Amino acid sequence: QMPNIYSEVKGELKMANIIIYGGGFQAAAAASKAASQAGNAQIYVIIPYPVSDTSKAFGSIGTLGGQNFFDVRHWNGSFPYRGSFEWWYSQGGSFYNTETMAARLTTDVTKYSNVQVFYGYDIFSFSTAASPYRITQVTIKKIARNSSTGFVEWSTGTYTLSGTVFVDASDDGRLTRLVNFGGTVGRYDWPSNKLDSDERGSSGKPRQQVASLMFQVKNIQ
C-alpha cells in the first residue's frame, strides 16, 4: 500500500545515463536495446513488482504472472511482431513456457555489463527541474508482499537514482503519472491514412494505441 505523501528518504545516490522503469517485455526491450546501442552509457532498470530470490526475472504478467503474450496468429499472412519481440517469439513460439521466457528476457538484459537491475523496487519520491520541465532523480524503495494481507508494502532498502534519460516502460505508466508528464501515450509514427482527420498533423489529438482486455469466463456449457 503506497502512501500519497512522500518523505525525504534518499538512501545511496547512484548516477546513470538512462533509467528505465518497468519489468515487462517492453522494459526488457528498452533495456537491451539501450545497452547494445549505447555501450558507454550506464543503465538502471527498476522492476516495480515484488520478487523473491528465486523469481528475480523480467516479463511481469507475461512470465511471472503466467500469461502468454504471444498467443497470436498470422493476420493477413503477415507476422505482427518485429524487433526484440520477433527475436523472443523465435525463441519460444506462440505457446512459450513462462519460466523459460522469464529466463530468456533476463539473460538478454543482464548479459550487458552496463546494466544494473533493481529487482522489487518502486518509486518512493522524485525530483524535477524546469526549463525544460524534466525528471532529474527518482528515489526507489524496496517492496514486498505481505503474506497475511496480500498487499504490496514498503520494505527496507532505498536508493536515489539520478539520470539524464528516463523511460517509463511499465505496465501502468506510474512514473509518467507521478511526474505529471504532458506527453502522448499513443504512436506518433502511425501512417496518417490510418488516423482520423482530427489526429493528423503536428497539432492533432494524441493517438492512443489499441488496448485489449482479457476476461475469464466460467460456467460455459
Regions found by a protein language model. Give the residues of each.
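Short, Lys/Arg-enriched N-terminal segments with co-localized hydrophobic residues
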Residues: 1-14
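Conserved N-terminal/central alpha/beta ligand/cofactor-binding core
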Residues: 9, 39-42, 46-134, 209-210
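Beta1/beta-strand and adjacent pyrophosphate-binding region of the FAD-binding site
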Residues: 13-26
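Stable alpha-helical elements in mature extracytoplasmic
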Residues: 26-27, 101, 105, 171-175
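Gly/Ala-rich phosphate-binding loop of Rossmann-like dinucleotide-binding domains
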Residues: 31, 35-36
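Core beta-strand elements of the Rossmann-like FAD/NAD(P) dinucleotide-binding domain
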Residues: 153-165
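Glycine-rich loop(s) and the adjacent beta-strand/alpha-helix scaffold that form part
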Residues: 165-221
